[in-house]
């Protein structure tokens, strides 16, 4: 009987670990914004930006997202709206001033799920770091809109960051093949 118990214990541990899933956090910067009025702190998207928002929806169409987060700006909301409508999700607003607390909330509320975050050039990489990942690139410039980051947090807490692109390529974007991330 003791041997049977040990046998079941040994072979059930890997099964129970496999049943638990990694958490996936997808991060993008908002799509192209109107820049004709430098005094406008909350601009809309350009036509190219609206197209990129549709491209984001296409990129994530097979993913079962549990939640979509964005900052309280028109450009982030408009970037997220097409995918939110397709997935029948209500966009949740987050405060980019406290990314550590936001990352903790994501990991606590969405363990084993898939999350989309639409942020800004000065918050996306910082959010990756707050989630425990390493920056795969040093910075996102003002004219780069096509980066798509995936942060996978395993059940054991290991963090893996990958990046690529979506939609039309931004000229100055670093190729995902030019930089490897551990």
Whereabouts are the PLM-identified features?
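Long, charged/polar, surface-exposed segments that mediate recognition or autoinhibition
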Residues: 121
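Residue-level preference for the first positions of well-ordered beta-strands
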Residues: 25, 114-118
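Short coil/turn segments at secondary-structure boundaries
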Residues: 3, 93-94, 115
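Active-site-proximal alpha-helix that buttresses catalytic centers in soluble enzyme cores
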Residues: 20-110, 124-128, 134-144, 148, ...
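Bacterial Sec-dependent N-terminal signal peptides
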Residues: 1-22
